Amino acid sequence: MGVKKKKEMQVAVLTICHQDLETLKSFADAEGKNLASLLLRCVQLTDGVSQIHYVKQIVPLLEKVGKNGVCDPTIQSCLDILAGIYLSLSLKNPLKKVLASSLNSLPDFFLPEAVHRFTSRLQEELNTTDLYSYRKVIDNISSCMENFNLGRAGVNNLLKNVLHFLQKSLIEIVEENRKCAGNHIIQTQLMNDLLVGIRVSMTLVQKVQDFQGNLWKASNSPIWQNMCGLLSIFTKFLSDDDLLQTVQSTSGLAITLFIKTMFHPSEKIPHLISSVLLRSVDCTSVPEWFMNSCRSLCCGNVSGSAVLFLCQGTLAMLDWQNGSMGRSGEALLLDTAHVLFTLSSQIKEPTLEMFLSRIMASWTNSAIQVLESSSPSLRDSLNGNSSIVGRLLEYVYTHWEHPLDALRHQTKIMFKNLLQMHRLTVEGAVLVPDPFFVKLTESLLRLEWHIKGKYMCLGCLVECIGIEHILAIDKTIPSQILEVMGDQSLVPYASDLLETMFKNHKSHLKSQTAESSWIDQWHETWVSPLLFILCEGNLDQKSYVIDYYLPKLLSYSPESLQYMVKILQTSIDAKTGQEQSFPSLGSCNSRGALGALMACLRIARAHGHLQSATDTWENLVSGARIKQGLIHQHCQVRIDTLGLLCESNRSTEIVSMEEMQWIQFFITYNLNSQSPGVRQQICSLLKKLFCRIQESSQVLYKLEQNKSKHEPEKELTKQHPSVSLQQYKNFMSSICNSLFEALFPGSSYSTRFSALTILGSIAEVFHVPEGRIYTVYQLNHDIDVGRFQALMECFTSTFEDVKMLAFDLLMKLSKTAVHFQDSEKLQGLFQAALALSTSTKPYDCVTASYLLNFLIWQDALPSSLSVYLTQQVARGDGDRPASVVERNTLMVIKCLMENLEEEVYQAENSLLQAAASFPMYGRVHCITGALQKLSLNSLQLVSEWRPVVEKLLLMSYRLSTVVSPVIQSSSPEGLIPMDTDSESASRLQMILNEIQPRDTNDYFNQAKILKEHDSFDMKDLNASVVNIDISTEIKGKEVKTCDVTAQMVLVCCWRSMKEVALLLGTLCQLLPMQPVPESSDGLLTVEQVKEIGDYFKQHLLQSRHRGAFELAYTGFVKLTEVLNRCPNVSLQKLPEQWLWSVLEEIKCSDPSSKLCATRRSAGIPFYIQALLASEPKKGKMDLLKITMKELISLAGPTDDLQSTVPQVHALNILRALFRDTRLGENIIPYVADGAKAAILGFTSPVWAVRNSSTLLFSALITRIFGVKRAKDELSKTNRMTGREFFSRFPELYPFLLKQLETVANAVDSDMGEPNRHPSMFLLLLVLERLYPSPMDGTSSALSMGPFVPFIMRCGHSPVYHSREMAARALVPFVMIDHIPNTIRTLLATLPSCTDQCFRQNRIHGTLLQVFHLLQAYSDSKHRTNSDFQHELTDITVCTKAKLWLAKRQNPCLVTRAVYIDILFLLTCCLNKSVKDNQPVLESLGLWEEVRGIISGSELITGFPCAFKAPGLPQYLESLTRLTIAAVWAAAAKSGERERDVPISFSQLLESAFPEVRSLTLEALLEKFLSAASGLGENGLPPLLCNMEEKFLLLAMKENHPECFCKILKILHCMDPGEWLPQTEHCVHLTPKEFLIWTMDVASNERSEIQSVALRLASKVISHHMQTCVENRELIAAELKQWVQLVILSCEDHLPTESRLAVVEVLTSTAPLFLTNPHPILELQDTLALWKCVLTLLQSEEQAVRDAATETVTTAMSQENTCQSTEFAFCQVDASIALALALAVLCDLLQQWNQLASGLPILLRWLLGDSDDLVVCVESLHQVEEDYLFEKAEVNFWAETLIFVKYLCKHLFCLLSKSGWRLPSPEMLCHLQRMVSEQCRLLSQLFRELPPAAEFVKTVEFTRLRIQEERTLACLKLLAFLEGKEGEDTLVLSVWDSSAEARQLTLPRTEAAC
């Protein structure tokens, strides 16, 4: 947020040759006043900026000399030297422009001489013959033409020579480019030179005066000949595909420009160019020079790209303004359009598509220019209804969703221009009723809002015709647009459209209304929907609206802020019962109004719409509201409130004392946020605040220094600057105290991450002073031993983010290690790091790496390490003394390598011993970490590093050789049995030999038979195996028990491979290479690089373990990136050679190949990915093109079994390449061929091919339609129109159509066994993602219509799932308006009941299609009600004609079910269309037919005994749904409750089928819930009254879990007072016995039933407590049982649902059991329930914590507790809810007068369970387990010591305020003895820990530290109770905190916390 320093100008120094220098010296005068002296002084300077000052003095000096100096040899020589200087300067050197500007002011009398001198110097430049100097000459010619008079005159004089030079240079550069094929670096440079040469040629033609006349046009003129030569060169460039497309496109521009310049007469130019574009040149009618220069354009086959670039030249280089080319120009314009349309259907290469879109946009610009003065015929050709505009609109609609942003932007320009074109053609007419605009508007509004192009086009339309016409069509458009702002991909488009609309609307309203009343209408339209979203929208929606839309609205209309604040304040007041809530802002219990208020104020302040912070707090929002916002339950409210405090549009605005207090309050409760996004925002906002403090402190400091009475800032008048500075210092110190305290033992990852990030920001913002800059605070001053130790202990975190942040923070501080650690401690740290580097826990080596790097950079290594340095290095003498860091790094790496060498040697003897005792990957990781921190390009000890690098490479290869057999085996994951019995170790020799990579791909031909143990020939095996046996242990020389698991061996091996790969990649990436072997520079030789490449190739192509080859890929990518940038040509060509080699190997693959064809080809795709992804993207991507061609050829279907393996490899590699985002749009041209290969491969008889094809197809679906962004598989965000799809992939249109036709024909055939056609599955998967757009034109070239009949026929498939897919795929292919007719057609194809022969599969498929079409029609929005009802009536009549399919006449239950579903859907649609009146249904007789179906169904008659048939559950569910609808319909008739009801709910509930009971109960539950919540309009329907008895009976006998659960839910919804008295009569259980039964269910059933039963039991308990006040003691035992049930149900291991149920129960019973002024439960039980609340508040599940905060809110909002805190009735976050809960509990203990009884219990909470210390002891003494990744219950949110801190603090507050004292000391004797014993045991355990225990025994050390803090807290409280501490001493926490002390002094916070 601070002001950035202006970057200093870099100016290269000008120099001159020795001869010129001597000339200047000879002419310089003694006084130093002549021009030679001035130039001499200038060139002798070493600072370019100072030289500028001298250059500016040249002309004034010459002006003084006057005319007399014209003949002065000194002046002449100086002018000559100046010309040389100008031409020697680089193009970008500011001195060049300064010199040109100065010489432009040269007196006229010096000009001839200056031009002469300049011309001669330029001639010398043009004579150069060095090809690599051509670029400098071309740059000089270019600069001469740019505002430099002398340069232009010189070029004019030498025009012939200049043109000749350009011609020669272009020819030679192209030739050199061909010679350097393969050298990317040189070729890129040459291409750039070529491009500049063409541009300079064009500049010459446009700017040189000679070209304005006709003298040069003589055919024998040298200039003319050179021009013809250049034109010929440009023509060749245009068609040369070896050149970059930018060169070709610029050549197209140059050709048009040269033709325009050279052709005569100019009137014929349009006709000539038109004939060239249309390829219809009459060779006899064009000049000879044109034929000679452009023969290939006239007679040859011109490529599409060449024509495209000629179109670009035509539009860019010809003069279209004012119709200067006349009718021929208009004809050329139309011809160009038709050529572009033709090209658009041919060009599919991404870069050419981009060119095409730009050129088409350019065409529309040219058309506008021509239309401004055009003929009527052209206007007719270009109006909105013309074919050309129609084609252009189709192009826009096809490409407005294109993945390339730049292309989408061009479609916007085109659309905007098309609107302008139409306006010009109808000039003078009224725009809004214009049919073209009206039709366009309606079409756009019909589109779904997920289409990005809709926003862009609507925005253009609003700018063209205004918003009022659009709002007249639909007033809800602003709300509709805001609704979609939850989708991040649409947010920028939606906010831009809204901005365009509200600006246009405001302007319109202002112009229409003279009064100010218009603002109310504007607010209603644009602000009210915004406020609704801010209050009621989902989190994403609200966040995006705040970030994108709100700032735009407030910036445009700042006055709206007051309106918004007023509305929101009213809504917040209504929430607390002061006023009625505004309906638009939702219910009174919504979170929104406060959050919306904070968001509005935050944006307003950040954008400068608030005068000052003080005004905000005093006038707009109270301090209480700020605090509520800072601890609000919803994170966005907290973020917005913090943003309000931190952000300001003025970086120097003073931070007020109130703001600082609120920030401190915020930090106390908000560090432990689990959301990464929230953490990032908190840290970012606080950094902004720190920047404000730093910058405003500069202002205050200056004011204090100057003692100025004039204070520019209003805030400064309130107090003296020194006071504010002191406040700043205290505040920052307090913040740092809080942050360091947050690093306590056991603090969560979130807390540590937040605290360290904020501390890092503080260290960065308040850096150590430099120069005179004042720093108000320095973090260094607040670092002590304890804080240093806390930062060091962060290295032990299992999260690397925390380690990295701690390391970075320590690096920002001064040398802390030396200050706070003695040498013995440092030695211990180093030894701990070495020990951790060989730990079997993978994360330990990361800790070791950070520890070692810390010791290296702090120069805190043990002195003993110096033995690893030579004497010379150790002394540090020599010309270039090595840096301390380099020396330390070298020592550590040598030490690690020495250890590693010994361990590799041991691993060669026993890999198992290595895996169990010293896995080697940790050492390698530490070496890589040390190298990455060092700047390897500027090493000083090169001679020392060379042998180290060489040894490191050899060591890596050795290590890899040891572990590779495991990784390269065919089954690396399960090689060693999970035995911990050491006796089985003798068998491991055989296993390790067996795993050698001798496996092949012969599984295609035969199954692999494992040899019997007896027949193993160990000698044969050993002959091919590296010596990796465990003979040392087995043969008895040194028998060592070693428990090894497969997991340990595998982890050791694949991680070792991973680390070696990363090390090698790092070495290649960071180490400088030796240009030649003898060179003294560089550390890596060419041979070493090649060896590394071979290593990666071997392991990527042979490794089977994914972890190994994925990380090898990461290292290999680093190598390939380096090679492609390497100037060494042999290295640069290595990736290409490797690629050809592996492709050849794949092509030759057979079943005996060692390339892995299982595991998705293992590392092979990664290998090829790395080679292709590193290819320079700016080049032609030749490697990608050739590779894709080869792979697609291999992936195609083949009859040769020998080609199966290559086909599998090709499919797997293609999948990887299509998934690689780095290839971007370059891969798109191959998508169609890839899809063909996948679809055809899916029909292969070989399983492996089908499997790989499926994976490839999945990758292609993602590549085409995007990453899935919604739960719905067919989400609209992952679909596209058929036109867009087939325009992007036109080859797929005939392919898919043909394939679909083949499949449909086969499905319909009546011959033999049904063909299931696997490819149908893939075809339908693609087609169901397409849909027709209302914007599709009438063109039938890519129509989706031909697909429809084939998809319908696919619905006849014998495969059930295929029929479903066909039905779903059909829906998007049928336009909404055509659906009714299609449904009627489908229904007509169904058989009649009299037909003798019919196929149920066909019937089923047809019915499914009808159902899905009807569903889509009912969901559609854009239709009128009357049309809808009419169409549905027709469909109903057709449906009734085939009603036999729903009756018993149809023997198939599956088709009956679907037909019944259609009937059910029809009843729903018709009901909806007439708003619940049913005359249509009755008049059609549909209900009567439905009742007939139900009466004749098995629901009435029952099924035969043990009846089973396919589709029975589905049929029952469909029939039940229809029956329930019929019952409700009959019951809805007033006064006719059960008339015509064929079956009652009671009968349905007694059905033997759970499907029937479940659906019935679901329907009833919905009604009961609606009645219970008050949402039902008329309460409970009469049909459901008096059903209590039925539900009780059902509850007792129901044995289906789902039904049982719903019955309990219904009972829970009902009033217990109504049904509980009936239990004895109905189920022979007294209410008390029923309660016991309910609790038994809650104790024993599975989780969902348990949760419902617990809720029901709690409701029954509450009922008993409230109605039987006198007889409460009768259920005391049950009450205790219930309490225990609640306690057991909130344990962490239980499902979330169970704990949420407990929270709900506690919330509902809180007034009764938790906060009752007269407690019902015993104190122990009451406190046990409170402990449940506290436990749930510390749950790791966010949902559970949030729900538990509702319990706390309820508890602290009761009449007797609302004064305990300042946050009664507020929604708070769990972090502060924990503190508030304890505050309320302590207050209640005092109210109940139960402090004496409650205190021992609370002290036990403080001390923890007795088991905690037992765990500490056991963990310290147990032997470390061999299992690496044990899954244990870990809570990453709860922080034990935070709970201890809050509890301790509130107990102290309670005891000190109440003045309470122990009645008798004996009460706590037992506790005191326990605490004392615990202290003694802790002390003993600490002594048993090894040195540096925090690193080597982290878990045990942390447990002990936590227990120690708990014990200390308990001791302090006991001491306070005994009176050993003064009553005025208030101990706030386990660790004394001045920050907390200040916290309590904040107004009203004392009670809150």
UniProtKB/Swiss-Prot annotation:
UniProt modified residues of type Phosphoserine: S1015, S1024, S1161
A Pfam family the protein falls into: TPR_Trm732
Keyword check for Coiled coil: yes
Keywords, in A-Z order: Coiled coil, Phosphoprotein, tRNA processing
Keyword Phosphoprotein: yes
Cysteines joined through disulfide linkages: none
Coiled-coil blocks: 888-918
Annotated GO CC locations: cytosol
GO biological process, one term: tRNA nucleoside ribose methylation
Family: Belongs to the THADA family.
Protein's job: Together with methyltransferase FTSJ1, methylates the 2'-O-ribose of nucleotides at position 32 of the anticodon loop of substrate tRNAs.
PANTHER family to which the protein is assigned, alphabetical: THADA/DEATH RECEPTOR INTERACTING PROTEIN, THYROID ADENOMA-ASSOCIATED PROTEIN
Name of the featured protein: tRNA (32-2'-O)-methyltransferase regulator THADA
Species annotation: Chlorocebus aethiops
